[in-house]
Amino acid sequence: NDIETFRTWIPFLLQQDIQVLTVHLRTRKEMSKVPAHYEYIDEIVKMRDEIAPDTLLQINGDIKTREEGLELVRQHPGVDGVMIGRGVFENPFAFEIMPTEHTLDETLALLRLQLDLYDEFTAEFGPMHFQKLKRFFKIYVRGFAYASDLRVALMDTNTTDEVRALLDEFDKQWEAKKAEDAVAIEAK
C-alpha cells in the first residue's frame, strides 16, 4: 500500500511481455480518497521506455472527461491512453468529443441504451445479476424534479422490461407536467 512500491512492481509487470499496462495512480488503501499521483507519470513512462518500449501505457485516476484525458496525455508524452473510471458516474457522456449540455430525454435515452446493451450481453453470455445494473441508475436519474422518486421506483424493478415500462410511464407524466407548467406560465 506504499505508493513507492510502484518502483519495483511496475518494472516487474513490464518484464512480463504485456501489451498494455494500465496504472491506477493511487494505492489500494488510498482508493479515491486522495488525488491521483500524477507526479509519478513521467517516471512510469521512463520505466516503460527502458524496460518494454512496445508496451502501451494507460493511466487511470481522477479523469472525468475525454478532454481531461487528452490533456493528461499532452502533458505527459509517452502516455498512450487513459481510462475513465468513476468519472462516468458523474457524467454518463464523459466520452463525448464535443461536450454539450444534455436534456433529460437524451440522458434517459442513454439509460435505455444501457438497458439494451445489458439485454444483448445477457442473451449472448448468459444471465447476469440485475442488481449490478441498478447501481447505474443514479448516473442517469438525478438533477431534475422527481428524480429521487423515480430512482426509488427504479430500485424496486427486477427486469429491464420493468425499467423500460417505468421510464415510459415517467415520460408520459413528465410531458404532462411540462405542458401543465407551460399553461400556467402563459396564464400569468
Regions found by a protein language model. Give the residues of each.
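Active-site beta->alpha loop and helix N-cap motifs at the rims of alpha/beta catalytic domains
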Residues: 1-4
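Alpha/beta catalytic cores of nucleotide-metabolism and tRNA/nucleoside-modifying enzymes
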Residues: 6-20, 39, 43-59, 63-188
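Glycine-rich, proline-tolerant flexible connector loops at the mouths of alpha/beta enzymes
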Residues: 24-32
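Active-site loop ensemble at the mouth of alpha/beta enzyme cores that anchors a bound cofactor
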Residues: 35
